[in-house]
Amino acid sequence: MTTVAGGVRASARVLARGDGRGGTVLPVLEGEGPLAVRRTRGSGAEARVMLVGAMSGPLGGDHFEVGAHAANGARLRVGSAAATLALPGQDKAGARYDVRLTVDDDAELYWLPEQLISAGGSDLTVTTSVDLAAGARLLLREEQVLGRAGEEPGRLTSRLTLRIDGRGVLDQELLCGPGAPGGWDGPAGLAGHRAVGQLVVVRPGFATEPPAARVFEEGAAVMPLAGPAALVTAVAPDALRLRRLLDGALASLD
């Protein structure tokens, strides 16, 4: 961890590999400062890792980076111990949170952090970059809550890119809060909802049997992507309803 003018810079890194006996080992498990990583009890061939926030933030001016790589034969599940709370800092600059995920052939990554809460007065840019081999499997969940109870949201910019076998499959950006383009909270945007989320599901079997595009209950939709992948998007009045929508849509894909 380093402290620079205006904020903290910290990173965490996880590398998982198949052990050749049907299990998964973690040769790299590194974190610093506000980004602590802990191995927890896994199940079967799966290794589980928890991101633990050792400090509050990100605050204005902070820059956090997290990387996870599921190498050949690995089964890796990554979660977080609590929600991430973006807060304003003494520095008026925005904060950054960059996530880079890589999954090799015959490997699987479940990326399931808790919600990101954009507190009033905060300014956070989140980028998630995912690179998958042709035979990789992925479940990625993103959930954003705009403001705490009774509070207007901060400014939140979130971009997600997905590449499979070197080919771009998804590149989308969400901008909410002060300074966002007009209409972000209108009928064509979030329509007054304060929780928004998505799932990206990549399974080789989707190449021959892609899921059908459909509405899943009120506020959620399932869409096939141009690859062995599906995207679930949802909006809801609160984090609890959002999670229920995403979980239900995921179950419908099985």
Curated annotation (Swiss-Prot):
Keywords: Chaperone, Cytoplasm, Nickel insertion. InterPro entries: UreD (IPR002669). Coiled coil: none annotated. GO terms for cellular component: cytoplasm. Its main location: cytoplasm. HAMAP family: UreD. Required for maturation of urease via the functional incorporation of the urease nickel metallocenter. UreD, UreF and UreG form a complex that acts as a GTP-hydrolysis-dependent molecular chaperone, activating the urease apoprotein by helping to assemble the nickel containing metallocenter of UreC. The UreE protein probably delivers the nickel. This is Urease accessory protein UreD. It comes from Streptomyces coelicolor (strain ATCC BAA-471 / A3(2) / M145).
